[in-house]
Amino acid sequence: MSGDGPDGALSDAAHGAHRAAHKAQHAAAEVEQHRAASWVEALGQSANGLVHIVIGAIALGVAFGAGGSADQSGAMRALRETPIGGVALWVVGVALVALALHAFVIAVAASRRHRRDAVRAAGRGIGHVVVGTTALVFALGGSIDGEEATESVSTTVLQHPVGPWLLAVTGLVIAGVGVAFVARGVRRKFFDDVAPPRRFRRLVEALGTPGFVAKGIAVTIVGGLFVVAAVSHDAGEAGGLDGALQSLTTVPGGVVALVAIAVGLMVYGVYCVTRGVWAR
């Protein structure tokens, strides 16, 4: 019999919520183990890898004086200009949105016993949704400028009294994510996500280590730009991935660093494909 009074009602509600959460975690765990999940992982990670390879190629061109936006929007624009651009964008968009849903399922399944893994999975899911949605917008004939969107949001934030603080915190969080990527590469922690056959382990290590380090450095620079924008109260200083990579061309030795990061991003893209094939 349910408890009487407000306290009893609250207790019943709490137990009901706990049971619902447990059922959701159990259902998510079953979905995660389904054979279809491995196909979603393989296709989604391959799409993710393709996007990174294209971004890296554009960044390499920027280092040698070519134009282009070395970010997700630039990658989608480049894909759209290929003979199979429309089909490629639809495949990439759908695959990444599906991969995002898969990541959210993992987050729910891990939320009770592995909180850190759940947070990481949820973060990946959000990232995949953003990139997948961008691909679908381009597939439908639309366009998104990542740098303009970043500057617009930063301008709006800086108009509020606590805006600079919010922008600075955002930058520090992004930089923290970048540092985590670097650490994951240096410590070979990416093997937590991929289980290649023994004969391919060194290949995956040769891809994952520089790939994670390069992506981590790029993301850290993005975070740094947000902090600079917050300190200078200038939204124009904030930038996304393209802004971060373009900024390297203005500092001594930056072009060399940009070439290294560009190659690293392409290597990371190949790693993503291996992760899709040999996901743990």
Tell what function each PLM region has.
Residues 2-91, 95, 276:
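An N-terminus-focused feature that recognizes amino-terminal "leader" regions
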Residues 6-10, 106-125, 185-209, 276-280:
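Cytoplasmic juxtamembrane regions at transmembrane-helix boundaries
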Residues 35-36, 58, 84-184:
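Hydrophobic, ordered structural segments
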Residues 35-52, 115-128, 206-217:
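Alpha-helical transmembrane segments and their helix-start/interface "positive-inside/aromatic belt" motifs
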Residues 60-71, 136-151, 227-238:
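Membrane-helix interface motif
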Residues 74-79, 153-157, 200, 235-256:
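Short, membrane-exposed interhelical loops at transmembrane-helix boundaries
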Residues 101, 170-173, 177, 245-278:
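Alpha-helical transmembrane segments and their immediate juxtamembrane interface regions
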Residues 208-249:
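Glycine/small-residue-rich hydrophobic helix-like segments
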